[in-house]
Amino acid sequence: MTNDNTKNVVVSSRVRLARNAAKIPFPQKGITVEEVAYLVKCADKAADFEHQLVFMSDLRDVDRQALVERHLISPDLAKKDLGALLISDDDSIAVMINEEDHIRAQCIKNGFRLQECYNAIDRYDDNLSKVMDVAYDSEFGYLTACLT
């Protein structure tokens, strides 16, 4: 019997979550520039890591496609001008603003590092809940536009 370690290789780990502001309609229902500005402000305040804030309206199509290919934004956000991306300096944490949900945060790290990813996103979520009233229902939990 041979020991085939190729079956045990983990290329990357990802943890992500979606959060919505309690008093702002989901993006599919229509959202104003002022509401997106509020979400950007909250997302930025919640970040306790070095990061850049990029507005989708400032990006060329080729830059948007590069971010999609690097799994930092979704194809849906790439099509929008009214949205933003907050990205950590090491590219491990990306926060999409005004995608399917108001805030879509993710952490991606190489290898099998789910706990590290979870810890980073959990900390961000804790910080976000301090600066934004998050849409939550006692029966259904966090309210989201997308159940995945």
Question: Could you tell me what each predicted segment is?
Answer:
Residues M1-E139:
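Long, Pro/Ser/Thr-rich low-complexity/intrinsically disordered regulatory tracts in eukaryotic proteins
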Residues F140-L147:
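Conserved phosphate/anionic-ligand binding catalytic regions in large, soluble enzymes, centered on
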